[in-house]
Amino acid sequence: MEGSMNRDFEFKQLLRAYRSGIINDATFETEMKNLEHGASNGNGAGFTAFGKTYATEREAGIKFLEAVAPAETAGGEAIRMWLSTCKLDCITGGLKMVAERESYHGRAFAQRLTELGGTVPSASAELRESIAYLCDANMSDLEKLHTAATKFPNPDETIRPLFEFAEQLKEDQQTKEMIKLFAQDELSTLKWQNSLCAVLIEMKKNGQLAAAA
């Protein structure tokens, strides 16, 4: 019963996107086939991702996009705020690349969510609070980098669930490939920040870095 209600909701989302011109005939037809395929192959067990169980793969994908699209956009905005005050060239260079990545991730995922009939929510207060330190003018650049690095000390383990989720997706090949590339970008960012942080901390210990850095 619950699965049927979820499919009805997903169909209405698709129909709304189609009627409003957000998706074309081909996309609508493809997504309808995916929805029907998910219904015909359902075994009652649901689709499990990130420790939660969803009625369908489609529902899991939409929930993922709803969470990630605003988070990436907010991350890009916060990093640009940091860039406006950053004093270390090595950090500035990396931040420029990361800011662009975050922003285009947000745009691409928002577009995909809209194509699926979803609506992009605003970034939550909890999310904005968790990245507020990036905009804190009272923190040094190294302190900010160190804070970011300590949040994710093991990049491979942090990003592994994203790769696993992408591999689970069988029906939505568009979202699958987007998530795979997103995960590679995120892994690159985490490895960059952790590696650079270690180098700068060592330089500071040896007196090779200004105290204000």
Task: List each language-model region with its residue ranges.
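Short, Lys/Arg-enriched N-terminal segments with co-localized hydrophobic residues
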Residues: M1-S4
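Non-heme di-metal
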Residues: D8-S20, N24-A213
